[in-house]
Amino acid sequence: MSLPSPWRADFPAFSAFAAEGLTYLDSAATAQKPQAVLDALNGYYLGGAANVHRAQHVPGERATRAFEAARSRVAHWLHAGNPAEVLFTRGTTEAINLVAYGLERHFRPGDELLVSALEHHANLLPWQQLALRRGLVLRVLPLDERGVIDLEQARHIIGERTRLLAISQLSNVLGTWQPVVELIQLARERGAWTLVDGAQGSVHGRHDLPGLGCDFYAFSGHKLYGPDGIGVLWGRPQALEQLAHWQFGGEMVRHTGFHEASFHAAPLGFEAGTPAVSAAIGLGATIDWLATLDEAEVAAHEGALHARLLAGLLARDGVSLLGEPQAALASFCVDGVHVADLAHLLGEQGIAVRAGHHCAMPLLQRLEVPGALRVSLGLYNDADDLERFFLALDRSLELLR
């Protein structure tokens, strides 16, 4: 079965890749962009760029309408109740830092912050550093042998001192879906805030906020086939009201003198300075493009490709998967082979994958591996991409063994 992607033609980058002999299998790091997004970016600049929320002229009003329309599209896509619940950020990393700084005043020494053992540095370091600043306790939820947060152990760890739970929806290293709904329920029973890192999960169909029940949800545009430099923090209205302002400057201020100021509520109060106007408009176009797709068809295509990827890896001697991948990607090691050497040889054959710790050093330390090679899929990949990857992998292993 050839498993062609019916959406590949929407992505101009693949024409360029074909001309260069490249096979792109690194979508968990960043995704390629469909023509609809490129058209939106180009159209904004060709029509005249302007700042938003601060001009009475036609270009400014036009830019503001497009910017806020993008916010509304994101809110609708997330099934959020109100566009005002959507804050634009530079990405998932900034969104999580915003929450960490915004909630800091509410914590007292000895309060507990909970993350899991698989977190990306973006959902670890903000809480680690907050704990160090405020004398808090950072606790780590362990994983089971599959690479899934152990719910039974979590029930014993989430307790009276738990004030915040921050977890990833889909591991960027293990490719495992996490039991976020159950964990959120446990945390809410203790009155703790909950944040979900949706950088990977949002890309693969799980972006229904009412179904999650979290207080905050963060994701990045560039992994979702959208522009770089734009991300989203969604917040429950009651949770957003608890955030202190953390960046200060133009347009987030309601009134200021030399010695005091008052600030806007969300979202504008958390979007200081000139926002990424074009990127936000491009993200709106991304959401529009995604809305034209049949999610079940996309899921079936990605699932079939992922199954073929796993089968091919497991069929090769010496290959060990990290965890039990369920979606989108697979990370692996090869006995007696350094992943950097393997990635180099694959790159020389035009195969774009990633090697290293994948911004999850503590996870790889717990797994007792110095690094791993990751293959990650997008909806534009097809079986031919995997065939080229496996051919290059076999050639590389012949040289390295």
UniProtKB/Swiss-Prot annotation:
InterPro entries (alphabetical): Aminotrans_V_dom (IPR000192), Aminotrans_V_PyrdxlP_BS (IPR020578), Cys_dSase_SufS (IPR010970), PyrdxlP-dep_Trfase (IPR015424), PyrdxlP-dep_Trfase_major (IPR015421), PyrdxlP-dep_Trfase_small (IPR015422)
GO terms under biological process: cysteine metabolic process
CDD domains on file: SufS_like
Keyword match Transferase: yes
UniProtKB keywords: Pyridoxal phosphate, Transferase
Gene3D superfamilies (alphabetical): Aspartate Aminotransferase, domain 1, Type I PLP-dependent aspartate aminotransferase-like (Major domain)
Gene Ontology molecular function, alphabetical: cysteine desulfurase activity; pyridoxal phosphate binding
The protein's Enzyme Commission number: 2.8.1.7
Known catalytic reactions: (sulfur carrier)-H + L-cysteine = (sulfur carrier)-SH + L-alanine
Cofactor: pyridoxal 5'-phosphate
Modified residues (N6-(pyridoxal phosphate)lysine): K223
Similarity comment: family membership: Belongs to the class-V pyridoxal-phosphate-dependent aminotransferase family. Csd subfamily.
Function field: Catalyzes the removal of elemental sulfur and selenium atoms from L-cysteine, L-cystine, L-selenocysteine, and L-selenocystine to produce L-alanine.
Entry-linked PANTHER family: CYSTEINE DESULFURASE, CYSTEINE DESULFURASE 1, CHLOROPLASTIC
Protein name in UniProt: Probable cysteine desulfurase
Organism: Pseudomonas aeruginosa (strain ATCC 15692 / DSM 22644 / CIP 104116 / JCM 14847 / LMG 12228 / 1C / PRS 101 / PAO1)
Lineage, highest ranks first: Bacteria, Pseudomonadati, Pseudomonadota, Gammaproteobacteria, Pseudomonadales
Chain's gene name: csd
